[in-house]
């Protein structure tokens, strides 16, 4: 539940979870902190009073942690104790909920496991924690975790959950059980399906004033039996016999970190009957229930799954001009890690999307990885009260602009160079944006093919280039002279659809110049508008000048016979 996470976040924030403090004046810091406090209060009220998840738990946790970091940065008092105040109900737990300490990695787990025996691992089921109180064999109370000491009395709703036995016998007849109410799933793969807001659905069903049909879909995973049988095996078998079979089915003894890691990976990728967000590792023997206190469960820890999404801050916005003149927006981010990948920037897309999202520096955004591990911006979570929005370029760019390295053309010019060095054109190894920018700036490239005229000695003068690197690069550049005519036409940026290059059999520049619109339309993917563009492109003065320069370099297909 959120309350335990909230208490842990105070410690994390003070330990430097967000190392960089914002560059704010004291007055601005007070305004921003107050605004975020108000937003968190609204989320808390929706969650605790109405059972509504306005944001995911991951988003909430991140923003709560961000608030604590800002308060620490500017030595501001903590006024918002909404999670504690709202979560705490009026019904005291017979045995307090301790919560679990979250470990960051295998190294931390190894340190915790050192010297311990009789260890067990369980899926960390993602639901809502409760206490079940049985007296004389009958269900007496079901209490929400709340602040760990007190919670809400959910007994009336719990009696409508078929998965909760109303009567038990034997050692369970007078017992206190702690577990997770969860939304039952069929074949849920956490790695693929994510959290699906399962926790919010459970909380909502339990907090409604009317009986919800969702209660029929709830189940219960018992993860603690304070003062029950001392041996873990005995507790699990008694629970299973008494109508709580899941703990026995999903509790596995472990002896090493590798044992835990194997099951963690297995449960992350394989189909399960519940949503999970990690694994829990616990000692088989637990202290007496009277000693349990919130935040003091030293005998149990959690190792969560890598987050599918992260909240981070936009540090800067950059406008990039592509080779065809289209302007896109790239956000520089406070670095975060997703699936072992460090993410420090994300493409926003077009100017229109940037304007629709209303993004500015300082905004808190949610980031995930799309297909092939490409960072993706999913949502704007928080906007500061004072926002900085950069002004986009005013110059007009198109498919024919910036063939020459003139002032104001730097971005599109470099984009053209990066494109022609790709596999689909010249396939120049090691020629990324940084290298092209370095060469262009140092050697003052006049146009798109100026690099072809560089000598080995000239390349040696490039800052950071060794003699070996210069020789290798010159050799690559020189080999492009042997590339077929079509590759050079592609490098010029001729706007011909990709599927039509094979149908184009021309191998002389003069042949392309001789084509009229009707001739171009004989190619399968070229219509009237594209034909007009092609004729205009080939006869543009800048293109004609570059073709003449390539002819002077005796590039095949351009040189006159």
UniProtKB/Swiss-Prot annotation:
Active site: 124 (n6-amp-lysine intermediate)
GO biological process, one term: DNA replication
Similarity remark: Belongs to the NAD-dependent DNA ligase family. LigB subfamily.
Purpose of the protein: Catalyzes the formation of phosphodiester linkages between 5'-phosphoryl and 3'-hydroxyl groups in double-stranded DNA using NAD as a coenzyme and as the energy source for the reaction.
Enzymatic class: ligase
Keywords: DNA damage, DNA repair, DNA replication, Ligase, NAD
One Gene Ontology molecular-function label: DNA ligase (NAD+) activity
Catalytic activity: NAD(+) + (deoxyribonucleotide)n-3'-hydroxyl + 5'-phospho-(deoxyribonucleotide)m = (deoxyribonucleotide)n+m + AMP + beta-nicotinamide D-nucleotide
Annotated protein name in UniProt: DNA ligase B
Highest taxon of source: Bacteria
């Amino acid at each position: 539940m959120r309350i335990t996470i909230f208490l842990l976040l105070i410690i994390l924030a003070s330990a430097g979870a967000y190392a960089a403090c914002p560059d704010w004046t004291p007055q601005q810091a007070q305004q921003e902190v107050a605004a975020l406090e108000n937003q968190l209060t609204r989320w808390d009220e929706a969650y605790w009073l109405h059972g509504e998840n306005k944001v995911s738990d991951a988003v909430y946790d991140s923003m709560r942690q961000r608030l604590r970091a800002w308060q620490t940065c500017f030595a501001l008092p903590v006024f918002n104790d909404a999670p504690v105040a709202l979560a705490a109900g009026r019904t005291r737990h017979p045995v307090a909920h301790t919560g679990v300490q979250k470990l960051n990695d295998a190294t931390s787990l190894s340190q915790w496991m050192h010297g311990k025996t009789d260890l067990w691992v369980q899926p960390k089921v993602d639901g809502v924690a409760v206490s079940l109180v049985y007296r004389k064999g009958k269900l007496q109370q079901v209490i929400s975790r709340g602040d760990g000491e007190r919670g809400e009395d959910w007994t009336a709703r719990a009696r409508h959950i078929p998965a909760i036995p109303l009567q038990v016998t034997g050692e369970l007849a007078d017992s206190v059980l702690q577990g997770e109410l969860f939304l039952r799933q069929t074949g849920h793969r956490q790695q693929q399906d994510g959290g699906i807001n399962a926790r919010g659905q459970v909380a909502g069903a339990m907090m409604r004033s009317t009986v919800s049909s969702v209660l029929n879909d709830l189940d219960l995973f018992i993860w603690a039996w304070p003062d029950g049988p001392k041996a873990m095996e005995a507790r699990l078998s008694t629970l299973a016999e008494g109508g709580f079979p899941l703990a026995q089915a999903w509790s596995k003894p472990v002896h090493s970190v590798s044992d835990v890691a194997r099951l963690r990976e297995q449960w992350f990728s394989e189909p399960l009957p519940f949503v999970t967000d990690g694994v829990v590792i616990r000692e088989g023997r637990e202290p007496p229930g009277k000693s349990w206190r919130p935040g003091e469960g030293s005998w149990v820890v959690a190792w969560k799954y890598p987050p599918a999404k992260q909240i981070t801050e936009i540090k800067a916005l950059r406008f990039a001009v592509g080779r065809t003149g289209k302007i896109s927006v790239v956000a520089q981010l406070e670095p975060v890690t997703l699936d072992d990948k460090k993410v420090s920037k994300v493409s926003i897309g077009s100017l229109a999307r940037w304007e629709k999202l209303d993004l500015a520096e300082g905004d808190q955004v949610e980031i995930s990885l799309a297909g092939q591990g490409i960072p993706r911006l999913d949502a704007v979570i928080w906007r500061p009260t004072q926002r900085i929005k950069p002004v986009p370029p005013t110059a007009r760019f198109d498919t024919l602009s910036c063939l020459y390295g003139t002032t104001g053309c730097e971005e599109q010019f470099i984009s053209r160079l990066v494109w022609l060095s790709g596999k689909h054109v010249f396939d120049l190894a090691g020629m990324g944006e940084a290298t092209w920018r370095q060469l262009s700036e140092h050697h003052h490239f006049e146009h798109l093919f100026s690099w072809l005229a560089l000598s080995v000695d000239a390349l040696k003068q490039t800052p950071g280039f060794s003699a070996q690197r210069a020789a290798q690069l010159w050799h690559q550049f020189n080999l492009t002279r042997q590339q077929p005519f079509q590759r050079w036409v592609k490098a010029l940026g001729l706007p011909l659809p990709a599927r039509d290059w094979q149908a184009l059999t021309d191998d002389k520049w003069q042949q392309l110049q001789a084509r009229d619109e009707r001739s171009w339309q004989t190619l399968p993917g070229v219509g009237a508008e594209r034909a007009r563009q092609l004729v205009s492109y080939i006869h543009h003065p800048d293109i004609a000048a570059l073709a003449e320069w390539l002819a002077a370099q005796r590039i095949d297909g351009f040189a006159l016979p």
